[in-house]
Amino acid sequence: MAKQTLLLSPPSLSSQPGKLNETLQSYNRNATDLQMLDRLALGLASLPDSTYSTIVILAGGDNSFSESLKLINRQTFNQIIGSLRRGGYIYGQDAVSGVAFDHNEAILAGLIHVGNGKYLKPDIEEMQAVPLRLGRKNDHLAGAPSLEGSAAEHPFPPEVSEGKTASGDNRVAVVGSQKFRENIVSAATMDNNEASDDELINEDNLLDDSELSAPIIQPPECRPKAGKRRRACKDCTCGLAQKLQEEDAVKRADADEQLDAMKLLHDDLAEVDFTVRGKVGSCGNCSLGDAFRCEGCPFIGLPAFQPGEEVRLLNNDVQL
């Protein structure tokens, strides 16, 4: 395949036809193409894929690559590299100091720096998928998927018996038969089953009765201080919180039981009618209170009331 060369020119060089023609004379015009960088950057022109063995970026009218660095972005650079053959080179114009494109972009595009500002596109073969042939599993294994095809489609190496080899040397014979593979699979399956059985632990056998009946050891921070009620930690794990809850439940149940025992029915209430004249103190100040009542007043201990007011006794409490 003939070598093709691509010259990439910045727009400022086209304004100097004499300098551009002088540059073109140093290349074979039959195997050289010229393309403007600004047209590639704007998407007005495109390059063929894997066509050129050499790509040269020309300097601008000021004999520098400042204009090329502005025009060659990542998208444009990838398009340029796509037109370069594998094993081809890309570099800036000779005898011009400076960098024609970004070094990092060249590395990211897969180029290799070979020195003197030249970058090589490595000749890497395309990746191909390699099929892997798997051995046929044992048919008696439960749940093992069977491979399609007969044994002829998946041949195994011939079996080599133990003992002396064809040369007469007493060496260990290599066995590659299907029987040997099946034995290995069966042994591995049995080992896995035994290992899984050994891992099972009965939780009821972890603690015996003596350990369950042992007293709870409280941490120092959970121990009650003198004169204060014990308080459980927020994340208590020593059993103090559960014990305090049980004590509170017992106290609440006792209080409810006592409250039910103290309840009186309507028949248990005693009514006192003060409109009926009964015992009257000699002082006549029975309704004023104990401060005004005499020593033998029948209303001692009762609060002050209005004359003729009805007084009820409920749970040993006076209700007016």
Swiss-Prot record:
<dbReference type="InterPro" id="IPR031838">
    <property type="entry name" value="Dre2_N"/>
</dbReference>
<feature type="short sequence motif" description="Cx2C motif 1">
    <location>
        <begin position="283"/>
        <end position="286"/>
    </location>
</feature>
<feature type="region of interest" description="Fe-S binding site B">
    <location>
        <begin position="283"/>
        <end position="297"/>
    </location>
</feature>
<keyword id="KW-0411">Iron-sulfur</keyword>
<dbReference type="Pfam" id="PF05093">
    <property type="entry name" value="CIAPIN1"/>
</dbReference>
<feature type="binding site">
    <location>
        <position position="238"/>
    </location>
    <ligand>
        <name>[2Fe-2S] cluster</name>
    </ligand>
</feature>
<keyword id="KW-0001">2Fe-2S</keyword>
<feature type="binding site">
    <location>
        <position position="236"/>
    </location>
    <ligand>
        <name>[2Fe-2S] cluster</name>
    </ligand>
</feature>
<feature type="binding site">
    <location>
        <position position="286"/>
    </location>
    <ligand>
        <name>[4Fe-4S] cluster</name>
    </ligand>
</feature>
<keyword id="KW-0963">Cytoplasm</keyword>
<feature type="binding site">
    <location>
        <position position="283"/>
    </location>
    <ligand>
        <name>[4Fe-4S] cluster</name>
    </ligand>
</feature>
<feature type="region of interest" description="N-terminal SAM-like domain">
    <location>
        <begin position="1"/>
        <end position="130"/>
    </location>
</feature>
<dbReference type="GO" id="GO:0051539">
    <property type="term" value="F:4 iron, 4 sulfur cluster binding"/>
</dbReference>
<feature type="region of interest" description="Fe-S binding site A">
    <location>
        <begin position="222"/>
        <end position="238"/>
    </location>
</feature>
<keyword id="KW-0408">Iron</keyword>
<comment type="subunit">
    <text>Monomer. Interacts with tah18. Interacts with mia40.</text>
</comment>
<dbReference type="InterPro" id="IPR046408">
    <property type="entry name" value="CIAPIN1"/>
</dbReference>
<feature type="region of interest" description="Linker">
    <location>
        <begin position="131"/>
        <end position="213"/>
    </location>
</feature>
<keyword id="KW-0496">Mitochondrion</keyword>
<dbReference type="GO" id="GO:0009055">
    <property type="term" value="F:electron transfer activity"/>
</dbReference>
<feature type="region of interest" description="Disordered">
    <location>
        <begin position="141"/>
        <end position="166"/>
    </location>
</feature>
<dbReference type="GO" id="GO:0046872">
    <property type="term" value="F:metal ion binding"/>
</dbReference>
<dbReference type="GO" id="GO:0005758">
    <property type="term" value="C:mitochondrial intermembrane space"/>
</dbReference>
<dbReference type="GO" id="GO:0016226">
    <property type="term" value="P:iron-sulfur cluster assembly"/>
</dbReference>
<dbReference type="Pfam" id="PF16803">
    <property type="entry name" value="DRE2_N"/>
</dbReference>
<dbReference type="GO" id="GO:0051537">
    <property type="term" value="F:2 iron, 2 sulfur cluster binding"/>
</dbReference>
<keyword id="KW-0004">4Fe-4S</keyword>
<feature type="binding site">
    <location>
        <position position="222"/>
    </location>
    <ligand>
        <name>[2Fe-2S] cluster</name>
    </ligand>
</feature>
<keyword id="KW-0479">Metal-binding</keyword>
<comment type="similarity">
    <text>Belongs to the anamorsin family.</text>
</comment>
<feature type="short sequence motif" description="Cx2C motif 2">
    <location>
        <begin position="294"/>
        <end position="297"/>
    </location>
</feature>
<feature type="binding site">
    <location>
        <position position="297"/>
    </location>
    <ligand>
        <name>[4Fe-4S] cluster</name>
    </ligand>
</feature>
<feature type="binding site">
    <location>
        <position position="233"/>
    </location>
    <ligand>
        <name>[2Fe-2S] cluster</name>
    </ligand>
</feature>
<comment type="function">
    <text>Component of the cytosolic iron-sulfur (Fe-S) protein assembly (CIA) machinery required for the maturation of extramitochondrial Fe-S proteins. Part of an electron transfer chain functioning in an early step of cytosolic Fe-S biogenesis, facilitating the de novo assembly of a [4Fe-4S] cluster on the scaffold complex cfd1-nbp35. Electrons are transferred to dre2 from NADPH via the FAD- and FMN-containing protein tah18.</text>
</comment>
<dbReference type="InterPro" id="IPR007785">
    <property type="entry name" value="Anamorsin"/>
</dbReference>
<feature type="binding site">
    <location>
        <position position="294"/>
    </location>
    <ligand>
        <name>[4Fe-4S] cluster</name>
    </ligand>
</feature>
<protein>
    <recommendedName>
        <fullName>Fe-S cluster assembly protein dre2</fullName>
    </recommendedName>
</protein>
